[in-house]
Amino acid sequence: MTVVVFGASGQIGHFLLPRLRARGEPVIAVSREPHADSEGVRWVRGGLPDAVPTLSPVSAIVSYGPLQPFARWLAAAASTGSPCVVATSSMSAQSKAASEVPAEREIARQLQQGEAELVAACEVLGCAWTVLRPTLIYGAGRDKSLTPLARRAMRTRAFPRPIGGGLRQPVHADDIALATLAAIDRPANRVLMLGGGERLTAGDMFARVQRSLPMATLPLPVPTWLLRLVRHAVPRLRGPLARLDADLVADNSELERLLDVHPRPFRPDARCWEPG
């Protein structure tokens, strides 16, 4: 059973590859950058949608990259047979759909369009499929949300703490890897939300990140009036700051029922912010 993985060098692939090796499943990892082969993993150079070498039939294809290029490659890749397909989207497909920021609404539209194109390609090819919509990802030190905050705090010894009452549900990258394996074994043929095993306020989430750091940092509460000022003065922060009091959570009931995956609660430690 050979598994092709796009995005294998990313934060979820960091956890998926060792788990596939532990199952004894050969892996073909596709990357734009060269990598040395390792036991059970063969790396090939390629990029979606039109710079991927011809692949012989495989049992499963996993993609952690942009959906639309992957869907378009898959639709034209008849040589792969009818493998099981697992791909990640994002809960931003929902949470940013009604954003006040046009660029964020466009992100949501592209995610939804990519999901639709992938499902259509799978149905034409007769592939079983699962699309995972994770919430805020952490755990490998490669995310663009919590890790930059943690590293900045370690450099400056100060941790800005926005006061946000909206709920968050961070999901560990390894739990997405576990969900991927479950979807290979039991394809759901649907889009599944994937949040962490715990919901907490944005303020509590930032507090736990601060407590996880390997050195003491000074908490700097950011008052609401300052957040409003920054929201209007810095356009690129308008969307994220507007969502501080919004609930950005996932309903894991279908994930648990169909894949029997139960993500861990949010208990970060210092290793979560180290580059994996």
Give a label for each model feature.
Residues 151-171, 175, 193:
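A conserved pocket-lining segment of Rossmann-fold NAD(P)-dependent short-chain dehydrogenase/reductase
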Residues 130-148:
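Flexible, glycine-rich beta-alpha linker
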Residues 35-82, 87, 91-102:
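NAD(P)H-binding glycine-rich loop region in Rossmannoid oxidoreductase-like domains
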Residues 180-239, 257-276:
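Mid/C-terminal beta-alpha module of Rossmann-like enzyme folds, strongest
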Residues 29-34:
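N-terminal Rossmann-fold cofactor-binding loop
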Residues 105-130:
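Active-site Tyr-X1-5-Lys
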Residues 109, 144, 168-171, 200, ...:
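Residue-level signal for the nucleotide or nucleotide-sugar donor/cofactor binding architecture
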Residues 3-23:
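N-terminal Rossmann NAD(P)H-binding glycine-rich loop of SDR-like oxidoreductase domains
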